[in-house]
Amino acid sequence: MKQETTVLVGISGGVDSAVAACMLVDEGYRVIGLNIKVLDSPESNPALQPSSLVISNREEFRIPVYTLNLSKRFREDVIGYFQEEYLAARTPNPCIVCNKKIKWAGLLEAADMLNADLVATGHYASTAFLGGRCRLYQGADKKKDQSYFLWMLQQKELLKTILPLGTLAKPEVRELARSYGVPAAEKKESQEICFVPGDDYCRYLEQAIPDLAERVRGGELVDASGRVIGHHRGYPFYTIGQRRGLGASTGEPIYVTSIDPVHNRIHTGKKTDLLSRELTASGMNWIGIEPPKKPFEATARIRYRDAPTPCRVTPLEDNRATISFHSPKSAITRGQAAVIYRDDEVLGGGSIVETTQ
């Protein structure tokens, strides 16, 4: 019975999570909200605290909301990861790590403390229990689909998760927000990384890592033949596919094609030099299927806005896999996620560690 089921909903202060909570109230669940703090002082009280956060101006959708300060964990597991990835010449995706280690971990821990049966978020994705497994699917609104960011979730998290917005488009969510009396109904969305002001990660790294100048120095910028065409200011400030800010004039557009931290060298080339047919991913997490033993056909995405592309997936030892695309992909980037799909279903994913042209 829904009336006897308590759902703890992650409340961010935005429209999506508020609507998710109101939908669950509307469906008859007992709903509690949890606002996870990640940018407060790590020394402040880490225990659950009552919050004055209101998700709706209508009395029937007023729910108790608690806050949980996970700033210390966020600094270690997300910000620390973000910095170290750039120092290792990889391009991180902090939102994926945050979903796994902060949002779902925090929700499930708080659910135990509050005796909640399930957890929910406002992500645009959906789940279904089929064949003895909880399966993860893309959201119906393909422009907003966030399944790419959820590939690290495992059965223990998904089996306790409800994703109410999975069948809705963003305009429908805003319309529901108005009908539910959600104050954030017209709130604009932020596309920035929450801890990087102005989305300027270069300036952030300079300010956040005191000894960055000692750990990273300028080096050579070379073309496809190895000829020095300029100098870079430090490899963490560059990413694969970058064209702007290279400081070299060759008479034609050039792009960062690879980063060599060992020799402190940035390699550049033409746009066609960015094309690759194959990647290797590590840390594979299989959601919709048992860890495969044989190659199989699927589609894969190599970045959030990427369209799923037909490929062949070959499992390897040590929880790795090779993904061979049927047509070349541009700017496959180490550190980003490769997420594997069958139609709309997320089969699994991993972190890109190597590419092959």
Curated annotation (Swiss-Prot):
Residues holding ATP: G10, I11, S12, G13, G14, V15, D16, S17, I36, G122
Enzyme class name: transferase
Compartments it resides in: Cytoplasm
A Gene Ontology term for the protein's cellular component: cytoplasm
InterPro entries: MnmA-like (IPR004506), MnmA-like_C (IPR046885), MnmA-like_central (IPR046884), MnmA-like_central_sf (IPR023382), Rossmann-like_a/b/a_fold (IPR014729)
GO biological process terms held by the UniProt record: tRNA wobble position uridine thiolation
Intrachain S-S bonds: C98-C194
Active site: C98 (nucleophile), C194 (cysteine persulfide intermediate)
Catalytic activity: S-sulfanyl-L-cysteinyl-[protein] + uridine(34) in tRNA + AH2 + ATP = 2-thiouridine(34) in tRNA + L-cysteinyl-[protein] + A + AMP + diphosphate + H(+)
SUPFAM superfamilies, per database record: Adenine nucleotide alpha hydrolases-like
Region (Interaction with tRNA): 144-146, 303-304
Record keywords, A-Z: ATP-binding, Cytoplasm, Disulfide bond, Nucleotide-binding, RNA-binding, Transferase, tRNA processing, tRNA-binding
Site feature Interaction with tRNA, where: H123, Q336
Enzyme Commission number(s): 2.8.1.13
GO MF terms held by the record: ATP binding; tRNA binding; tRNA-uridine 2-sulfurtransferase activity
Its job: Catalyzes the 2-thiolation of uridine at the wobble position (U34) of tRNA, leading to the formation of s(2)U34.
Entry-linked NCBIfam families: PRK00143.1 (NF001138), trmU (TIGR00420)
HAMAP family attached to this UniProt entry: tRNA_thiouridyl_MnmA
Protein name as catalogued: tRNA-specific 2-thiouridylase MnmA
Organism: Chlorobium phaeovibrioides (strain DSM 265 / 1930)
